[in-house]
Amino acid sequence: MKLPRLSIFSLLLIQGWLLVQAEVAESQSISTDPAILDQLEIFDNFGDVFEQSFDEQGYPGQPWYYQLKETVIRFDRRPEGITALIDYLVRIRVTTDDPIRIAEASLVGIPYYFPENMERVINLEGYTYQPGGERTYFSGDDAAVVDLNSRYKILEFQMPDVKEGSVIEYKYTLVRRYIEELPDVQFSHRVPVREVNLYMKNEPYLRYQTVEENIDFELDYSEVRVDTSSIPMVFTYQRPDPVFIQRWGARDIPPVESSAYVSSIDDVRGKLKFQISEFGNPRQPLENSWEFVAAQIQRNINPFRMLRENNELAELGSSLYSTLGLSEARIDSLFQYVNSRARFNNTGSVFTDSGLDHVLEGEPADQAEINMVLLALLRGAGFEAYPLYISGREFGRINLSFPSLYQFNRMLLVAR
């Protein structure tokens, strides 16, 4: 029996359309397998440590090592704005009976940026597993908050019942309100790392530029677009964009040599940095440059605007030690004037948006507040003086390929 001519034509049309769709999907690495999205649910593996976790070969001479580090970056659009949700799953295996090294392996510190509630840690849980099958649960309730500096706090905790042969596992989610940059994802540490996996689930309205830093090991990269739509592939129907997933992975990452750095391990630690590069619907490219960083400072936290709001300090500087003129002796005298009256609270800082009246009254003040007072006195006395923003030795070198306000952690002054 012959098919009607219209049906044959329709079949040929459909067949040709399917071939075109297959070629398009292949060229764009589009997958229709939703199982790929299951890889992002790293918390589903929490609490399920297999026997091979205890049987695998360790690293000779190393007291402990990271068996697994997995990170998933995703985004949530909320009424108050877009939030980054970053899931972390970490497994550590202890291979020593040295109590000091065991304490080192079991002590965990999670840094987070606390001003303006920019970051917070949720979903913190953990287990300590023993080769015999026993496990001890850590609820996260015993974690302590420790002040690191004016911008960062550390959520610190000790995993329980850790001994030689134990496997430590913990998970948490970092909720971040500032999406222009994301926290660095660290690949290398003071001990070896067996396996690292990083996934980023992108949203249609934003993309990130990735900057590699100290990646001297093999780092695999792949990307896939997953079609999750149930809408038929007909050109007259509007279909949502496929889910764009990026993945980075590495295995057997060597430890960072302690002798390889002088001030900060971050100078030599292998990591990825993320900075927003496109935003909107449709997406538009965004400017990332040091000129833009300078414009941000002038627009949002202009130190000279604060000086204008504290004109009495300039008047004070004009009157102090005026007989010394514009000499180095006067600069030194103004420095000693501030130094003898200010009370440093041991907090290094870059910018300040609070008042300055308390500094010369001997109330506790941070580095930026004290230096802003000295800057006002110097400029009031007629000196050419400017703030100098730096990264302190303990904070690590500035990466010139990654323009960011958050690479600075201290403020100094230049005067002449």
Language model region names:
Residues 1-31:
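Bacterial Sec-dependent N-terminal signal peptides
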